[in-house]
């Protein structure tokens, strides 16, 4: 299965075989020396050109390749390590360990290109996935095997929310997480690794990085590398896995770069004509089966804040819930800075979450919306000009705002407050009490950065005695 290179165009390499035609997505190895240093480059077949010639995408830099160079087809797609051995380690797109640690002690490998679970194997039951984060569980609950879009600019706390979710899954569900850095900044990937190490969650997560400086093939396929590791835990171990993709926009962006290099005619805004199909290929594999589930949280970058751009628009079609982080909320010192009016969930329905949950969540949103509407009047005329009823709404809304904040386990080193996991029952009990006016006589400071309502009452007692 030997062949030779006939053309190199940046990350696209044409290869010719004398008596063999590799299948689409098959891996091809090229071993060559650059300045005396041995290099192993992996190519992936993307198109058949006829006459036993194939067009491939390189998974690493192609500097040093020359025409006529020998290559060897593997006869199978790229395979990556799976199983418990991958936890706490960092991998690149081809499954090599890149954290400078000891070699991997496992021979178990799975191909990155796999079929999505069939209809009969999928689980049709919609279950809520408890995260232990009050604002998420109350306003925009995640569903098991669902997909969540995490929208937010730089510095509003996307990474901290991701790390807390990884911690809570490990702590409450004894589950594992997989993090795929798709077109990530190397610095951010490095920071995340060290923060997870300090936060004590590294041994429950596998990290896969295809950074910004890598060719489009690596940035595109890294999502499949991470997903394959997650699928193993779901299908073989029967676990509920959490899968993080940061950033899903870069997956679409790298696909558009590859498409142009492969000579396909671009469609709207220069994106690949196969954008919807490629997005579906990835997203359809993220689902619940009868054995376990993969719940994914995907950070979504919105170019120029244009939600109608084809890339984010192709993601929206697949999302079950959106968690929107707002800078205005983080400026108030309320963390997590989730916008309770901007975040949505498909399962916030009385038939799925229950009548009480739905009633409390909509009640909270109504009070916060009323407070938002009154803010202009308060800014111009002050609180004294409001009616007694409106004053009560404002007081309750301010308590709700503060009660939506929560000390995180992974942020203990910054806040000095021990982290709190709040069950859904405790969350509903607390917000229901505020809406009913049970805690109207308690100062709003008592609700800031606490877990359940009991802690708020204890804090109020301490403030009173101080």
UniProtKB/Swiss-Prot annotation:
It is a peripheral membrane protein. One of its GO terms (cellular component) is plasma membrane. The keyword Transport applies. Its EC number is 7.1.2.2. Disulfide bonds: none annotated. It catalyses: ATP + H2O + 4 H(+)(in) = ADP + phosphate + 5 H(+)(out). It is found in: Cell inner membrane. It is an enzyme of class 7 (translocase). One of its GO terms (molecular function) is proton-transporting ATP synthase activity, rotational mechanism. ATP binds at residues 152-159. PROSITE patterns: ATPASE_ALPHA_BETA (PS00152). It comes from the Bacteria. SMART domains: AAA. Keywords: ATP synthesis, ATP-binding, Cell inner membrane, Cell membrane, CF(1), Hydrogen ion transport, Ion transport, Membrane, Nucleotide-binding, Translocase, Transport. Its main location: membrane. InterPro entries: AAA+_ATPase, ATP-synt_VA_C, ATP_synth_F1_bsu, ATPase_a/bsu_AS, ATPase_alpha/beta_chains, ATPase_F1/V1/A1_a/bsu_N, ATPase_F1/V1/A1_a/bsu_N_sf, ATPase_F1/V1/A1_a/bsu_nucl-bd. F-type ATPases have 2 components, CF(1) - the catalytic core - and CF(0) - the membrane proton channel. CF(1) has five subunits: alpha(3), beta(3), gamma(1), delta(1), epsilon(1). CF(0) has three main subunits: a(1), b(2) and c(9-12). The alpha and beta chains form an alternating ring which encloses part of the gamma chain. CF(1) is attached to CF(0) by a central stalk formed by the gamma and epsilon chains, while a peripheral stalk is formed by the delta and b chains. Produces ATP from ADP in the presence of a proton gradient across the membrane. The catalytic sites are hosted primarily by the beta subunits. PANTHER family: ATP SYNTHASE, ATP SYNTHASE SUBUNIT BETA, MITOCHONDRIAL. Belongs to the ATPase alpha/beta chains family. This is ATP synthase subunit beta. It comes from Helicobacter hepaticus (strain ATCC 51449 / 3B1). The lineage of its organism: Bacteria, Pseudomonadati, Campylobacterota, Epsilonproteobacteria, Campylobacterales. The gene is atpD.
């Amino acid at each position: 299965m030997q062949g030779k290179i006939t053309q190199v165009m940046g990350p696209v390499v044409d290869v010719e075989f004398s008596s063999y035609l590799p299948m689409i997505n098959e891996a091809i190895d090229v071993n060559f020396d650059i300045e005396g240093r041995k290099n192993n480059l992996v190519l992936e077949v993307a198109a058949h050109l006829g006459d036993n010639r194939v067009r491939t995408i390189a998974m690493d830099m192609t500097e040093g390749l020359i025409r006529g160079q020998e290559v060897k087809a593997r006869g199978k797609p790229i395979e990556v390590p799976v199983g418990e051995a991958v936890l706490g380690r960092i991998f690149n797109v081809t499954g090599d360990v890149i954290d400078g640690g000891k070699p991997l002690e496992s021979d178990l490998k799975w191909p990155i290109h796999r079929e999505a679970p069939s209809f009969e194997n999928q689980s049709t039951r919609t279950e809520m996935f408890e995260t232990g984060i009050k604002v998420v569980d109350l306003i925009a609950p995640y569903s098991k095997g669902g997909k969540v879009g995490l929208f937010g600019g730089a510095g509003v706390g996307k990474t901290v929310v991701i790390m807390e979710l990884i911690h809570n899954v490990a702590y409450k569900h004894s589950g594992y997480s997989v993090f795929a850095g798709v077109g990530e900044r190397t610095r951010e990937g490095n920071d995340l690794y060290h923060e997870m190490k300090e936060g004590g969650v590294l041994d429950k997560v596998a990290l896969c990085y295809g950074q910004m400086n890598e060719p489009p093939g690596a940035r595109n396929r890294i999502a499949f590398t991470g997903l394959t590791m997650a699928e193993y835990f779901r299908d073989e171990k029967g676990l509920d896995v959490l899968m993080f993709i940061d950033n899903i926009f870069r997956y679409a962006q790298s696909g558009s770069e590859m498409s142009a290099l492969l000579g396909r005619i671009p469609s709207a805004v220069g994106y690949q004509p196969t954008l919807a199909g490629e997005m579906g290929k990835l997203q359809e594999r993220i689902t619940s089966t009868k054995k376990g589930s993969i719940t994914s949280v995907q950070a979504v970058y919105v170019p120029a804040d244009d939600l109608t751009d084809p890339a984010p628009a192709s993601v929206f079609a697949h999302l079950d819930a959106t968690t929107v982080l707002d800078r205005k909320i983080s400026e108030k010192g309320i963390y997590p800075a989730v916008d309770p009016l901007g975040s949505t969930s498909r399962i916030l329905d009385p038939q799925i979450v229950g009548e009480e949950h739905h009633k409390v969540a909509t009640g909270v949103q109504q009070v916060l919306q009323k407070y938002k509407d009154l803010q202009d009047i308060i800014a111009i005329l002050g609180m004294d000009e409001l009616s007694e009823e409106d004053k009560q709404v404002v007081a309750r809304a301010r308590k709700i705002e503060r009660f939506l904040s929560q000390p995180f386990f992974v942020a203990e080193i910054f806040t000095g407050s021990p982290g709190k996991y709040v069950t859904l029952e405790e969350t509903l009990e607390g917000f229901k009490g505020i809406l009913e006016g049970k805690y109207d006589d308690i100062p709003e400071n008592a609700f800031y950065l606490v877990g359940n309502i009991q802690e708020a009452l204890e804090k109020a007692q301490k403030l009173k005695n101080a």
